[in-house]
Amino acid sequence: MLKKTMNIADYDPELFKAIEDETLRQEEHIELIASENYTSPRVMQAQGSQLTNKYAEGYPGKRYYGGCEYVDIVETLAIERAKELFGATFANVQPHSGSQANSAVYMTLLQPGDTVLGMNLAHGGHLTHGSPVNFSGKLYNIIPYGIDETGKIDYDEMERLAVEHKPKMMIGGFSAYSGIVDWARMREIADKIGAYLFVDMAHVAGLVAAGVYPNPVPHAHVVTSTTHKTLAGPRGGIILSAANDEDLYKKLNSAVFPGGQGGPLMHVIAGKAVAFKEALEPEFKVYQQQVVTNAKAMVEVFLERGYKIVSGGTDNHLMLVDLIGRDLTGKEADAALGAANITVNKNSVPNDPRSPFITSGIRIGTPAITRRGFKEAEARELTHWICDVLDNAKDESVIARVKGQVLELCARFPVYG
């Protein structure tokens, strides 16, 4: 018989220790991976609720199981809040991840073998935008576009490729691009050749929700996002549209269920509903503005210290530090910073001579440190520490000093106070 007093600590101490160790790691490390963030205790409360027990195949009011009257309320709240947050007329909150949301869009708009124009992974795109190792690159004819010598998206090249190859779908969005995307220009190009415009705004959804980054929803036929990253919700995906096309909406819903998934994760959808409500609060806009301010402050210090930033700056939450020409790989930089309790990820940069497993760059983002309460002063100080480590990546005394400074700073700014 189940009892509410049951707990992991007593029953499975080995697992409990791993959970506790990860909790301590998050508190004592500075998180700079651009796709990571700290979700709220309210979201975690929803995810740990008895909603996890409920199967609810279908959609609100149209379920294949009984007993769904309350989970219908939960999902409807999430849908309506997502629509309000992004100015959409359609929202599907069931995708288990951003990649599965993207898969549903491909399934809706394309047939295998159709031509797609997507951002080159090496220039800042995403696996699901046409990488050969991903379903998108295996099932569709991918034409990649990229960035110019200034590190900005080359819209002239994009238009030339679109006219030449006539893709059925164009993809906007990225995983490692620090600029502002001109969604309107992309829609113009798509309309010129009669293509769908699909935007994956996973990385900037929180910035978009707060009005500090242009909203793609009015321009694209379909938009997807994750619900974590800058949005700071549970790990999951969403699909949005303002196309006012009921036939498209039905096809998108069918592509999620039954096309790609079975039962939705109702406890996660509840977490999404909470996160969307939090994102509608005025303080969320203040937070997102600070995310960008902190990123710009970090870029200034990197440039002062002689480091190259891809595109020369940032207009969002992330930056790519280009290490080409330095006696340091992205993998080595990642490891050295990790030893100092600073978590980043190695990342390929444009024209990278090294493999994706080694790389010549690191990607840095500010959503998590800003969530902890860091302002410009802390962001600048932290960046100097990062440069100290990168300048002395094999000097254990420098790494030890920086680790001590990191621990002191983390103690001043706990993740969950």
From Swiss-Prot:
EC number from the UniProt entry: 2.1.2.1
Q: What class of enzyme is it?
A: transferase
Cofactor names from the entry are:
pyridoxal 5'-phosphate
- Tell me the function of this protein: Catalyzes the reversible interconversion of serine and glycine with tetrahydrofolate (THF) serving as the one-carbon carrier. This reaction serves as the major source of one-carbon groups required for the biosynthesis of purines, thymidylate, methionine, and other important biomolecules. Also exhibits THF-independent aldolase activity toward beta-hydroxyamino acids, producing glycine and aldehydes, via a retro-aldol mechanism.
What gene does this protein come from? glyA
What is the annotated quaternary arrangement, including any partners? Homodimer.
Q: Which reaction does it catalyse?
A: (6R)-5,10-methylene-5,6,7,8-tetrahydrofolate + glycine + H2O = (6S)-5,6,7,8-tetrahydrofolate + L-serine
Signal peptide coordinates: none
Instruction: List UniProt keywords, sorted A-Z.
Output: Amino-acid biosynthesis, Cytoplasm, One-carbon metabolism, Pyridoxal phosphate, Transferase
Source organism per UniProt: Shewanella amazonensis (strain ATCC BAA-1098 / SB2B)
**Name the record gives this protein:** Serine hydroxymethyltransferase
Task: Name the domain of life this protein comes from.
Answer: Bacteria
Name a single GO biological process: glycine biosynthetic process from serine
InterPro entries in alphabetical order: PyrdxlP-dep_Trfase, PyrdxlP-dep_Trfase_major, PyrdxlP-dep_Trfase_small, Ser_HO-MeTrfase, Ser_HO-MeTrfase-like, Ser_HO-MeTrfase_PLP_BS, SHMT-like_dom
Q: Which family does the UniProt entry place this protein in?
A: Belongs to the SHMT family.
Q: Where are residues bearing N6-(pyridoxal phosphate)lysine located in the sequence?
A: 229
Q: What PROSITE patterns does the annotation carry? A: SHMT
Q: Where in the cell is it found?
A: Cytoplasm
- Feature type site, description Plays an important role in substrate specificity: 228
Keyword Transmembrane present in the record's keywords: the answer is: no
Q: Which residues bind (6S)-5,6,7,8-tetrahydrofolate?
A: 121, 125-127, 355-357
Taking the first listed entry, what is the main subcellular location of this protein, grouped into a coarse class?
cytoplasm
SUPFAM superfamilies associated with the record: PLP-dependent transferases
